[in-house]
Amino acid sequence: MTGTPPLCAAPDPDPRAPAFDVPAGACDCHFHIFDGPSPQVAERSYTALPAPLPAFRHLQRTLGLTRSVIVQPSVYGTDNRTTLQTCAADPAIKAVVVIDEDTPPDVLASCREQGAVGCRVNMLFGSNAQIDSLAGLAGRIADHGWHLQILGDVSALHDRMDAFAGFPVPVVFDHFGHLEAAKGVNDPGFTALLRLLGDGHAWVKLSGAYRLGPAGPDTDAAVADLAAALIAANPDQLVWGSDWPHPAIPQQEMPNDGAVLDALAGWVPDTALRHRILVRNPARLYGFDDDA
């Protein structure tokens, strides 16, 4: 990569409250912090602006969320210090870290002790991670009770998706499976994801909808169709995430996080089902006490 990777836009500093009653114990299952000891790696696809924990806390209070899952961003590589520092002192925050084949067992154990419950694999942006090699990684993290989180376009993985069914850990797909929404519910990769989800071999995050196509009603309608198909397949293995501070989203497309949460209510008008997606399912996947 030559030159400085493009600078990210800042998130909306004035999130509005959602238009529905958010249940107690609701969890944001996908956010990032850009602030702390971890340097941004040279080979990265964007340059993050500071996005500190106090700003996220303000967002949480405004949206009525009390639990959260911080996800290691690609720009920090395998330096998980900022991510772990965020969650180490707060049992209401869990972490998803990034490791590689050289990460020793004692580091994995240390990450777990600091609140890590899973690891993320980036299969986008030129990553050479392959499904065959992920089976070995899944075996390494199984002893720690972790899940494997996939950032990858399921439409590009369609002929290998069934391999995930044999993994010894839960497999979680970011951002609806990160396919272009216009490809629709009949895309072979998405139908493979639905099959995994329906059989209980996968989880899906209803997050990052604005990453799936150009802003506008056509993308909104296509995303709603994807959401409906996922809900029909298995609502008990769906979770929601804000994706705050929305890295690499242009300023003119930067969403207000109240609208991001309201989108969930549009996809899931049933109150009891929203409670499962916001409270019960995250408690089961990430190990929160399900007392809400």
Segment roles from a protein language model:
Residues 27-31, 68-71, 94-97, 117-121, ...:
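Hydrophobic faces of well-ordered beta-strands that scaffold small-molecule active sites
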Residues 30, 60, 83, 119, ...:
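Conserved, mostly hydrophobic/aromatic
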Residues 80-96, 223-231, 254-266:
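Short, electropositive alpha-helical surface patch
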